Amino acid sequence: MEKRVRLYAFDYNEVRTYLWAALFVVCNMALPQVAHLVPQGGIIFAPLSLVILVGACKLGWKTALLAAVFSPLVNNIIFGMPAWDVLPIMAVKLAVLAIAAGLAVQRMQDVTLWLLCSVVLISEMLGGLAATIADFTIGWPGLLLQVVGGYLIVNRIWKW
């Protein structure tokens, strides 16, 4: 079976793991600024999740996990968002997204819409029932962006 996309799994002893994680953190500093041009844009679009999802699918869970932990922290230090009370919850949800997506892609050796739907649902359900309902009610555009946008980026745009 021919793979449609090249997938990588960088390890913590490789410099490129940290370079890519740093690039994802920078992307996760810029993307929320764009999302916040729309009122409630951070809640609606969940911009940090898209970068973590794409990173986990393309470069493995370890690279994405570094970005998942440091992105909210760096954003809080520089921009004051997310707020301190939300930061740990967001970091855990992003970390679960990074690990779930990275391990699922590593196991399946492919990135499909069903796989992305599954890992996004898993990470969303961590916040409890009320938070999950709120995420789906308010943030459905962001969830759709994660699944469809992540699929297109990994399978169509980022080919190498």
Label every model-predicted segment.
Residues 29-33, 53-54, 73-77, 99-103, ...:
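Alpha-helical transmembrane segments of multipass membrane proteins
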Residues 2-58, 62-63:
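Hydrophobic transmembrane alpha-helices
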Residues 4-9, 16, 20, 33, ...:
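Generic, low-specificity signal for short hydrophobic/alpha-helical stretches with a mild N-terminal bias
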Residues 12-13, 56, 70, 85-90:
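Short, structured secondary-structure boundary patches
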Residues 25, 68, 72-76, 94:
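Helical-face signature of the major facilitator-like transporter fold
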Residues 13, 28, 75-76, 155:
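Detector for Asparagine
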Residues 37-42, 65, 80-96, 103-160:
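Membrane-embedded alpha-helical hairpins and interfacial helices in multi-pass inner-membrane proteins
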